[in-house]
Amino acid sequence: MKESILDVLLYLFEHYFSEDADLVRDRDSLQNGLIQAGFSPAEISKAFDWLDALSEQRPSVARPHVDGPVRIYHGPELDKLDVDCRGFLLFLEQHRILDADQRELVLDRAMALDQDELDLDDLKWVVLMVLFNQPGAEAAYAWMETQMFLDEPESVH
């Protein structure tokens, strides 16, 4: 049996969402497919709750990128996100892949995962899922998706 919410989310993303964004499946058929893949109903339910929270937090209008204050991490965020993760989020924001609202959404969704710590690869998947769900973020999503599968990350100009 697979154990974490992130495992369920990654499976959904890799097998359903990224293949055909227009594919509409009802929750029951997705749940049956996930159970057949070996996920527990409890983890599947948590993953759907995670996705529901993500879709509820979708901004209605994309705002232009503006330079804002530097994000200061605290307590549980420092425990869950190591220096590589925090540096990566700063990199994405400085290179306008994420805006401040999207960064906060990534942080919210990362903190909602049932893991004590996230590594950089896990955080990249969270970023990719958030960007996939953001209207107007197609270019940022495409750049991020490319970065996920390159051996050596490409710089942003």
From Swiss-Prot:
InterPro entries: Smg (IPR007456). It comes from the Bacteria. Belongs to the Smg family. This is Protein Smg homolog. It comes from Xanthomonas euvesicatoria pv. vesicatoria (strain 85-10).
